[in-house]
């Protein structure tokens, strides 16, 4: 099976120049009268954000509960949700022969206790990526659909919205979405720790065999 190389938006790296400067991250059309029409074109027929993943976010997510920076510590302390970081990175399936697959362009600092599942917030996921995502959700929730899950990324990250929506559609009933992500967590005084992405190599290998 031939795999296409998936390239993460440079805007998704906290240290990329585009993020620091804000270059290329604003809505391409500042005209309010055309905003609604253009925004509709950013979604696929299943309602997932399909491109321009770094953009202003809505106030809600289908099937999930929104958590703000001033609430997240209480949510973590009270409900102990599985913390899932979905920040995207470059994926090169052909590199698995060298024991690697994810190629982060800089260290990722996220909320302590988090599991990093890169790219699961994209709209159109390959079958092996869907399995990677769903298997980890089962593991992190002990197979219980009512166990809490909290998704985040960085500020203005539609991938965390997509991941929350997909988990809710799979039947998870306690989905939390933290739209401010690590930016909001750090700004509120939260500690960040360096984390490695979960390996996807076995999923790619299984897909190649099939």
Tell me what each language-model feature is:
Residues 1-9:
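Bacterial N-terminal signal peptides
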Residues 77, 86-94:
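Early exported N-terminus immediately downstream of N-terminal targeting peptides
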Residues 9-69, 75, 95-150, 154-210:
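Rhodanese-like catalytic fold shared by cysteine-dependent sulfurtransferases
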Residues 72, 80-87, 114:
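Short hydrophobic beta-strand that contains or immediately precedes a catalytic carboxylate
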């Amino acid at each position: 099976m031939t795999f296409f190389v998936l390239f993460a938006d440079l805007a998704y790296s906290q240290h990329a120049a585009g993020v620091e400067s804000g270059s290329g991250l604003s809505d391409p059309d500042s005209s309010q009268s055309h905003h609604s029409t253009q925004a509709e074109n950013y979604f696929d027929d299943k309602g997932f954000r399909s491109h321009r993943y770094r953009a202003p976010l809505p106030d809600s997510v289908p099937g999930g509960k929104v958590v703000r920076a001033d609430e997240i510590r209480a949510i973590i302390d009270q409900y102990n949700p599985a913390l899932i970081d979905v920040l995207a990175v470059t994926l090169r399936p052909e590199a698995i022969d060298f024991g690697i697959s994810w190629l982060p362009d800089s260290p990722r600092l996220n909320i302590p206790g988090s599991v990093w599942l890169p790219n699961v917030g994209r709209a159109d996921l390959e079958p092996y990526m869907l399995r990677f995502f769903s298997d980890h959700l089962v593991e992190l929730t002990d197979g219980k659909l009512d166990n809490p899950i909290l998704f985040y990324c960085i500020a203005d990250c539609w991938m965390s919205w997509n991941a929350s929506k997909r988990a809710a559609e799979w039947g998870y009933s306690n989905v939390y979405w933290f739209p401010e992500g690590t930016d909001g967590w750090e700004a509120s005084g939260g500690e960040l720790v360096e984390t490695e992405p979960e390996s996807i190599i076995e999923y790619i290998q299984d897909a190649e065999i099939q």
